A protein has these predicted regions:
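N-terminal cap/lid segment of alpha/beta-hydrolase-fold proteins
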Residues: 1-40
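Catalytic histidine neighborhood in serine/cysteine hydrolases
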Residues: 202-203, 207-225
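Primarily recognizes the serine-hydrolase "nucleophile elbow" in alpha/beta-hydrolase
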Residues: 117, 121-181
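Serine-hydrolase catalytic machinery in alpha/beta-hydrolase-like enzymes
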Residues: 42-132
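Conserved alpha/beta-hydrolase "acid-adjacent" motif
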Residues: 174, 195-201
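Catalytic active-site module of serine/aspartate enzymes centered on a nucleophile-bearing elbow/loop
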Residues: 220-221, 226-243
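Short beta-strand/loop motif that positions the catalytic acidic residue
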Residues: 182, 188-190
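Acidic catalytic loop of the alpha/beta-hydrolase fold
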Residues: 192-197, 224-225
């Protein structure tokens, strides 16, 4: 991991951009996180729209988490931002736009091509490097979308002990079986009127999770209308399980 820039944000948070091989990422840590008192880490998931486009939303989440005593980090997803384009993913995005513009159902082939290439091993490699930093000590949580990444990480990554998942992205059928293997505590957010989300599929996915502790928090409104108090509840969830 190589840090390529550093700045101190107004809220007393240190923001550092890094590269891990060809993977760009950003790490936010509270200034009050010295090596003598390492803090828990939350991995910030996001849709494959590019870190620059997602930055305002990501940094807002990072600042809130820092105020609660957490470090946060995120990486650029394959085929997005400045990373090389993947033809299969680009074709899936075009097929998705055509289907939605025509009001047609989004078939399984499009969903699989769009979601399955998003590389969970890259998140694990980032986690390996982040946990070597003296100011980060774990435990580790995952927060956000794409929900399929959160599911897969919860299954294969034992260092993640709690997750806040956003039920607002397409889910390959294979993920429903994997959801049954998830056993960590879950806090799931669902926007009830999300125009791009299959509400029933989101409810079925929640039902499939194997966790003994799981809660579903549904709110009226579209995809970007998550109320502030929903974030407050998610923060309390992480404080219970990571502190």
């Amino acid at each position: 991991m190589h840090f390529i820039s550093e700045q101190r944000l107004d809220d007393g948070v240190l923001e550092r951009e890094f590269t891990l091989g060809e993977i760009p990422g950003i790490l936010w840590t509270p200034v009050s996180a010295p090596a003598s008192a390492p803090v828990p880490l939350i991995l910030l998931g996001h849709p494959p729209l590019g870190l620059r486009r997602m930055y305002p939303r990501l940094v807002a989440r990072a600042l809130d988490s820092a105020a609660d005593g957490f470090a946060t980090a995120t990486i650029e997803l394959p085929g997005s931002g400045d990373r090389p384009r993947w033809p299969v993913v680009e074709q899936a995005r075009s097929d998705l736009r055509r289907a939605m513009e025509a009001g047609d159902p989004v078939n399984d082939e499009i969903v699989d091509a769009l979601i399955l290439p998003l590389a969970v091993p890259e998140w694990q490699a980032a986690l390996d490097a982040l946990l070597l930093l003296p100011e980060i000590g774990g435990p580790v949580g995952y927060s956000g979308g794409v929900i399929s990444i959160g599911i897969r990480l919860a299954v294969v990554e034992p260092r993640i002990c709690a997750a806040v998942l956003f039920a607002g992205s397409f889910v390959p059928r294979a993920m429903f079986e994997q959801a049954r293997q998830v056993t960590i505590p879950l806090h799931v957010l669902l926007q009830w009127d999300d125009e791009g989300n299959d509400r029933q599929a989101a409810l079925d996915l929640f039902d499939a999770f194997g966790s003994e502790e799981k809660s579903l928090h549904a709110h009226l409104g579209g995809h970007t209308g998550v109320p502030q108090f929903a974030g407050d509840a998610a923060a309390r969830f992480f404080t219970r399980h990571l502190m």
